[in-house]
Amino acid sequence: MPEAVAKMRVCWLVRQDSRHQRIKLPHLEAVVIGRSPETKITDKKCSRQQVQLKAECNKGYVKVQQMGVNPTSIDSGVIGKDQEKKLLPGQVLHMVNGLYPYIVEFEEVAESPNLTQRKRKRSDCDSEEMEAESGTGLAPGSSPSQCSVSPKKDKNGATKKESLGHWSQGLKMSMKDPKMQVYKDDQVVVIKDKYPKARHHWLVLPWASISSLKVVTSEHLELLKHMHAVGEKVIADFAGSSKLRFRLGYHAIPSMSHVHLHVISQDFDSPCLKNKKHWNSFNTEYFLESQAVIKMVQEAGRVTVKDGTCELLKLPLRCHECQQLLPSIPQLKEHLRKHWGG
């Protein structure tokens, strides 16, 4: 008997004048849209974070929250600063001042058995990276010692993986929380990593909604350079007197769907660094140097990630200073103390 074809409902934000490609709005995930290379909007009256969109795919509408000062409207009705309205298919969203018209489209997408199998394989890699990264921004009042997150279990006792949408949601909430912010300007915000893997570990995030390195183009080049410069500024401002060495870079396959630059000291002295995947996500080619990413975009117009990259998370533990192999994380940490004199 043939296997039933699974279907899923997806939502798209579509610019009516077709100035750019449609933007996918994942189910129940907050997506911030505004002035950016992605939307092709350069009007300074449109904030870089003009609206927050959250698709209710099962119910067939999108919640729109106006975040910018200037008015966003749905069918000529102004939403209002920090207010929220529903956007239904057939209605027109004007991003700011009655300009830049958008509509939403919902469609049923059939998944073939082969696609489902590929997605399961990809999900395995995602869950490995999710465990490797596990960070969204430091919660108020927390400290590096507060790193444990109790895994959720179902009634049979099986551990449930946190969904990609949940992590992304937490990251975007952290970006907007003044208590989380270390630095911000009109292009980026810097927050502390919620689960720091070293004494100093920050995330530099653009306000513009850029889902991953996969969608980065030459149009984002200046933003990438600015993110790098801000990372160096944060090091100078908050660890300038430290003798610690730092690296700036991106995870090749991030667990959170919003581009973020890691700024991390190389002591790796943190109780949050708990397993091989944590270590290898920062100490193999899984970690893409910021300057290398910038060079790649300069020369090729995009970022290329090698096939099989997620397998790097399974490599043996190796000291990043002297290349000695260590059998376990506790022994690696003990070994690292010899390098930083702890």
Curated annotation (Swiss-Prot):
Domain of life assignment: Eukaryota
GO molecular function terms noted in the UniProt entry: chromatin binding; damaged DNA binding; DNA 5'-adenosine monophosphate hydrolase activity; DNA-3'-diphospho-5'-guanosine diphosphatase; double-stranded DNA binding; double-stranded RNA binding; metal ion binding; phosphoglycolate phosphatase activity
Sites of Phosphoserine modification: S123, S127, S134
Cross-referenced InterPro entries: FHA_2, FHA_APTX, Histidine_triad_CS, HIT-like, HIT-like_sf, SMAD_FHA_dom_sf, Znf-C2HE, Znf_C2H2_type
Main location: nucleus
Site, as annotated: Interaction with DNA substrate: S174, H251, H262, K277
Residue ranges with Basic and acidic residues bias: 151-164
An example Gene Ontology CC term for this record: chromatin
Ranges spanned by the short sequence motif Histidine triad motif, renumbered to the chain: 258-262
Spans annotated as Interactions with ADPRT/PARP1 and NCL: 1-102
Known EC number: 3.6.1.71, 3.6.1.72
Domain HIT: 168-273
Chain ranges of zinc fingers (C2H2-type): 317-339
Catalytic activity: a 5'-end adenosine-5'-diphospho-5'-2'-deoxyribonucleoside-DNA + H2O = a 5'-end 5'-phospho-2'-deoxyribonucleoside-DNA + AMP + 2 H(+); a 5'-end adenosine-5'-diphospho-5'-ribonucleoside-2'-deoxyribonucleotide-DNA + H2O = a 5'-end 5'-phospho-ribonucleoside-2'-deoxyribonucleotide-DNA + AMP + 2 H(+); a 3'-end 2'-deoxyribonucleotide-3'-diphospho-5'-guanosine-DNA + H2O = a 3'-end 2'-deoxyribonucleotide 3'-phosphate-DNA + GMP + 2 H(+)
Assembly, per entry: Interacts with single-strand break repair proteins XRCC1, XRCC4, ADPRT/PARP1 and p53/TP53. Interacts with NCL. Interacts (via FHA-like domain) with MDC1 (phosphorylated).
PANTHER family documented for this protein: APRATAXIN (PTHR12486:SF4), APRATAXIN-RELATED (PTHR12486)
Protein name per the record: Aprataxin
Taxonomic lineage of the native organism: Eukaryota, Metazoa, Chordata, Craniata, Vertebrata
